[in-house]
């Protein structure tokens, strides 16, 4: 395998423009296609499961972790300059080594979470095929990357254009980023305030198959 993981932030994510561009593409794709993602994980059994029984909620949001959320905030403010790094976890047991704590942490209440160097889509039921989800995920991200390519290929100053594109994209789509408790009633109210869809069943999701 000689490929490059485009979602690997590296040691200094704030300096990794390639990673930030692909991160922005995923954020935009998820925000613009949340209803289709919800549809891809929908059947009567899974509709009942979502939001309970250790399953993520039906509202689509992205968990980035403290490090990447801080970087997104810096980008939006226009002062990107640093990356938060993981702290050490001291168990208090002297015979055990001090453990490195992941800077992205974990949030099991998130339906779409960044975990180190990849995203996890966690809504799909165990009995469901991953084919539909993969088709939707790959298509929606490819569509956004195609839009990015069209814009960047005609840029006179590529570096300036890509930085501006990243800032514009995450600013417009940061509403879908949520690092808190996806099970809470407060999140349902906050998601509605942000304009995020709350598609509660397969029947409600069907009309989105024919929307633009």
Give each language-model segment a name.
Residues 29-212:
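Acidic, glycine-enriched catalytic cores built around paired aspartates
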Residues 2-38:
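Catalytic or ion-translocation cores adjacent to nucleophile or general acid/base/metal-coordination motifs
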């Amino acid at each position: 395998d000689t490929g490059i993981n485009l979602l690997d932030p590296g040691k200094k994510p704030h300096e990794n423009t390639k990673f930030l561009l692909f991160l922005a593409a995923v954020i935009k794709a998820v925000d613009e296609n949340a209803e289709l993602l919800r549809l891809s994980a929908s059947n009567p059994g899974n509709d009942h499961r979502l939001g309970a029984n250790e399953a993520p909620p039906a509202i689509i949001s992205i968990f980035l972790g403290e490090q990447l959320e801080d970087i997104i905030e810096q980008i939006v403010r226009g002062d990107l300059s640093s990356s938060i790094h993981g702290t050490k976890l001291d168990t208090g047991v002297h015979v055990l080594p001090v453990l490195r704590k992941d800077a992205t942490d974990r949030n099991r209440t998130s339906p779409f979470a960044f975990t180190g160097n990849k995203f996890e889509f966690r809504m799909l039921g165990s009995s469901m095929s991953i084919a539909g989800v993969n088709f939707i995920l790959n298509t929606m991200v490819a569509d956004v990357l195609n839009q990015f390519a069209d814009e960047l290929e005609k840029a006179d100053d590529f570096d300036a254009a890509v930085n501006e594109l990243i800032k514009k994209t995450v600013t417009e789509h940061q509403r879908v980023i949520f690092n808190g408790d996806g099970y809470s009633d407060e999140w349902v109210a906050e998601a509605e305030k942000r304009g995020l869809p709350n598609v509660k069943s397969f029947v409600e999701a069907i009309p989105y198959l024919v929307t633009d």
